[in-house]
């Protein structure tokens, strides 16, 4: 399916503007920041500071790259779901970090195995990846799961990243990890237009978190 007609029409109109084809600010136009913050407010009821808590990205893959570079050092460990998206492991391995898989429980709707996680040695874990709604399983997180994940990250001082490009798919009520109280302190969330708006080739996404993490990313 192509993007909506309104999207294509707007692209054609903007393409005819005289300043549309020059270099743009590295961090994105202020209007784009504001639009993304507005999207979060309308969709999830989450208030974000458009200037300091939102970073436009070239799809989730760029976000995965920059977050890994910002937070992971050689010899540290990264928690990755099994099954999960292979890209979460690639850069960590290049940087010399150790990828540690944690299981998703099939008969519990592919929720994380928190019992397994709590039994792990987490002393060298710097970053944890989650992906809900999940690819490849299609499992969807519950708000209870999001709350447990935020609590887990807080107690173990781990940066938690949820990749959320499927928020509108098979889901009448889109959810975000950022709806959990205190999530911004330890968590980062990616959203992408690729799946929800049929725009994979446009490479439009966003990263939201606290101002300190945004400055590092």
For the regions a protein language model found, what residue spans apply to each?
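A short helix-loop-beta submotif of the ANL/AMP-binding
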Residues: 94-100
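Conserved PLP-anchoring active-site segment centered on the Schiff-base-forming lysine
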Residues: 70-92
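Conserved core segment of the aminotransferase class I/II
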Residues: 11, 182-217
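A short helix->loop->beta-strand "cap" motif at the edges of active sites that frequently abuts
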Residues: 76, 97, 155-159, 183-185
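N-terminal small-domain helix-loop-helix segment of the aminotransferase-like
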Residues: 1-59, 66
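Active-site phosphate-binding strand-loop segment of PLP-dependent enzymes
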Residues: 100, 104-175
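Short acidic capping loops at alpha-helix termini that bridge into adjacent secondary structure
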Residues: 47-54, 74-77, 124, 184-187
């Amino acid at each position: 399916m192509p993007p909506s007609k309104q999207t294509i029409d707007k692209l054609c109109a903007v393409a005819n503007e005289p300043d549309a084809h020059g270099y743009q600010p590295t961090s994105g136009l202020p209007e784009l920041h504001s639009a993304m913050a507005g999207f979060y407010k309308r969709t999830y009821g989450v208030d974000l500071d458009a200037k300091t808590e939102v970073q436009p990205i070239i799809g989730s893959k760029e976000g995965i790259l920059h977050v890994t570079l910002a937070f992971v050092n050689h010899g540290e460990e990264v928690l990755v779901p099994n099954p999960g998206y292979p890209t979460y492991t690639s850069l960590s391995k290049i940087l010399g970090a150790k990828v540690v898989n944690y299981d998703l429980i099939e008969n519990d709707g592919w929720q994380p195995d928190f019992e397994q996680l709590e039994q792990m040695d987490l002393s060298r874990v710097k970053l944890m990846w989650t992906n809900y709604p999940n690819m490849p399983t299609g499992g969807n997180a519950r708000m209870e799961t999001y709350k447990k994940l935020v609590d887990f990250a807080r107690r173990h001082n781990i940066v938690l990243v949820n990749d959320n490009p499927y928020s509108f798919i098979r889901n009448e009520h889109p959810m975000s990890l950022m709806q959990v109280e205190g999530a911004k302190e330890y968590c980062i969330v990616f959203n992408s237009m690729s799946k929800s708006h049929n725009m994979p080739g446009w490479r439009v996404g966003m990263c939201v978190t606290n101002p300190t993490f945004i400055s590092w990313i």
